[in-house]
């Protein structure tokens, strides 16, 4: 839970657009890394205690926050600074908890972004049905709930997809961890253990490509991102 709540705490306003603006503005000083800034926030900037800085999180939590996406081969200066204070074994895989937090994040935003795209009018049902996997799920939803309102059927489609992804993750991960007997063996495994099956990975890859083409690079979305970049850049210039 701590990993899921804390792994994006370093994101600036406007998400990735804001981070790109800070990366540009701070290029002369080594750039901006939201992951490293989140760790800095949790270990130094948040200071509710009189006798030490930070939130006094466990090593496992800090390690998971630093490398929930896998081993870090080229840490920036900020993460190197934190690693010196709390040696985090950046070259190894993280705990199973951290791996689950990372893939749960993928499941959440993959499906939440479909909801957002439908509500914003950037996506419609025909767009989704262009993906064979979603088309199969849609036919199952229509068969099971033929008289439900269309908006509820669409929400059922998204809910069904979440369930299938979670079930696949659990099933494949159980197979992956057979024979792994300790946290040290998880870190030394040399590969991601909490993972989708190859078939589900392919479904997710196709879905992500679809979302980039139809939603993330939608002209209205790009214009919003440009405005967000401008806002953060101007605020940085005003307060730096």
Predicted regions: what they are:
Residues 1-24, 28-29, 42-46, 50, ...:
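Acidic/His-rich, divalent-metal-binding segments that scaffold phosphate/diphosphate chemistry
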């Amino acid at each position: 839970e701590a990993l899921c709540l804390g792994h994006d705490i370093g994101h600036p306003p406007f998400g990735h657009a804001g981070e790109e603006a800070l990366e540009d503005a701070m290029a002369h000083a080594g750039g901006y890394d939201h992951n490293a800034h989140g760790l800095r926030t949790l270990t130094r900037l948040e200071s509710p205690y009189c006798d030490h800085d930070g939130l006094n999180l466990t090593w496992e939590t800090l390690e998971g926050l630093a490398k929930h996406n896998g081993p870090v081969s080229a840490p920036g200066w900020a993460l190197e600074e934190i690693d010196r204070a709390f040696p985090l074994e950046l070259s190894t895989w993280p705990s199973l908890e951290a791996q689950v937090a990372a893939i749960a994040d993928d499941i959440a935003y993959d499906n939440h972004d479909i909801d957002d795209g439908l509500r914003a009018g950037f996506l419609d049902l025909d767009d989704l049905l262009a993906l064979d996997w979603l088309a199969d799920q849609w036919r199952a939803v229509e068969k099971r709930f033929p008289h439900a309102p269309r908006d509820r059927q669409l929400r059922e489609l998204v809910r069904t997809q979440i369930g299938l992804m979670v079930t696949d993750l659990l099933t494949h991960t159980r197979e992956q961890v057979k024979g792994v007997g300790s946290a040290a063996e998880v870190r030394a495994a040399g590969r991601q253990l909490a993972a989708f099956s190859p078939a589900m990975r392919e479904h997710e890859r196709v879905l992500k490509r679809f979302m980039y083409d139809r939603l993330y690079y939608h002209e209205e979305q790009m214009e919003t991102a440009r405005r967000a970049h401008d806002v953060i850049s101007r605020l940085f210039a005003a307060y730096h």
